[in-house]
């Protein structure tokens, strides 16, 4: 017989706050990310956007810049009442444990994302069976969108107003415009 989840509701006890994390690099945060965060609020009482500090990646924005861009984007969209932003290093599932989260939120753009997300969900379940992974399908208008694509658009001087918030667009332009000219692709 399986043991009940340590987060399970027990008769006579008030229900515990349901905390979810939405992990990622968010380099930069896009309208697709923010759409997933907004929709994830239907599944939890509090959402923590968990910005990974992965030393193996070379992000365009520093960890502090990414945290600030997310906070400012949430404020611009009036989404910050039940969403917090935090950074972490190490296993996502361990961070979820530390903050009492019972859900890990992931976004799926296409079937090509599914295999990787499925493997991550199984590894996370093996590490802690009390934490579930929930995948949300990306809204149709953002199904093509990725942070890599946004960085490339910015580097090439493309329109950013429909893919990121104004604060992120401004930060991207500041990173890529050098002396009035767009940065060279080798600068990335």
Model-derived segments and spans:
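Nucleotidyltransferase catalytic core that binds NTPs
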Residues: 2-188
């Amino acid at each position: 017989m399986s043991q009940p989840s340590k987060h399970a509701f027990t008769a006579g006890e008030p229900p515990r706050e349901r905390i979810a994390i939405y992990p990622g690099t968010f380099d930069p945060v896009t309208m697709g990310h923010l759409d997933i965060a907004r929709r994830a609020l239907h599944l939890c009482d509090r959402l923590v956007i968990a910005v990974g500090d992965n030393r193996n990646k070379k992000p365009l924005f520093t960890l502090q810049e990414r945290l600030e861009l997310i906070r400012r984007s949430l404020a611009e969209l009036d989404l910050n009442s039940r969403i917090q932003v935090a950074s972490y290093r190490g296993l996502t599932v361990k961070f979820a444990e530390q903050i009492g989260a019972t859900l890990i939120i992931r976004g799926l753009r296409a079937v090509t994302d599914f295999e990787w997300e499925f493997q991550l969900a199984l590894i996370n379940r093996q590490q802690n069976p009390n934490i579930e992974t929930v995948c949300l399908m990306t809204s149709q208008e953002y199904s093509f969108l990725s942070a890599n694509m946004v960085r490339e658009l910015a580097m090439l001087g493309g329109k950013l107003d429909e893919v990121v918030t104004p604060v992120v667009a401004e930060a991207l332009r500041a990173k890529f415009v050098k002396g009035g000219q767009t940065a060279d692709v080798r600068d990335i």
